[in-house]
Amino acid sequence: MEGPKKVNQIIIKTSQPKDIEQLLAHGAKADKVYIGQNGYAFETISPEGDHFLLHAEEDVSHLELTDLPSLTKDDAFKGLSDFTFEKIVLNVLDQENSRDFYLKIFEGEFPIELDFVQMQGPDLALEPHIAWDLEILEVGVPKDFDLAKLKSQLEAKGVSIYLDTKETVLVLSDPSLIEIWFMK
């Protein structure tokens, strides 16, 4: 890697605040611990430098930095029982271009919230298979979803599309060369 990665932060939300406490009690690596209205949250940085925030709040802006608490382990705890990927923050070469792409193509209906931070670095423009970084955003669609129709709609917006012959996978790339796969 040379310069910043495409992934700035991935924000994960759980509906089970007690799961966060148990992850911390069982020794989950927490680089920063926060407290909010619903309980604890924490940020961890992967060995590859990816930032993950796990929380159970309605609004993460209310989280306050705190010290790692002393928590009691529940031996029956099996892991995070419920979660959603709430938001992905991407480092991009052109913030406005990236934001405009997603608004134009998906008209505000992309299934996960995306945010963009303008950065500089050669790896931000690399093909996905060259660097260890975010390669694909996968979007599941129902079996009866008409990918051929979606292909036509996206091509009408000037987007280059790949659709497999069985019409089960449609692929396009965003300005950062992150592939977006619609899969049945």
Predicted regions: what is each one?
Residues 1-2, 75-79, 125-129:
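Short, flexible, solvent-exposed loop/turn segments with mixed acidic/basic and small polar residues
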Residues 7-10, 59-99, 134-137:
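N-terminal beta-strand motif that seeds the catalytic metal site of vicinal oxygen chelate
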Residues 11, 25, 65-78, 113-117, ...:
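N-terminal secretory/membrane-targeting helices
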Residues 1, 83, 88-123:
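Core segments of cupin and vicinal oxygen chelate
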Residues 49-59:
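A contiguous, low-structure linker/loop signature
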Residues 110-139, 147-150:
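Acidic/His-leaning functional-site neighborhoods
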Residues 1-6, 13-14:
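DNA polymerase sliding clamps and clamp-related checkpoint/processivity subunits
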Residues 11-51, 93-97, 121, 137-184:
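Vicinal oxygen chelate
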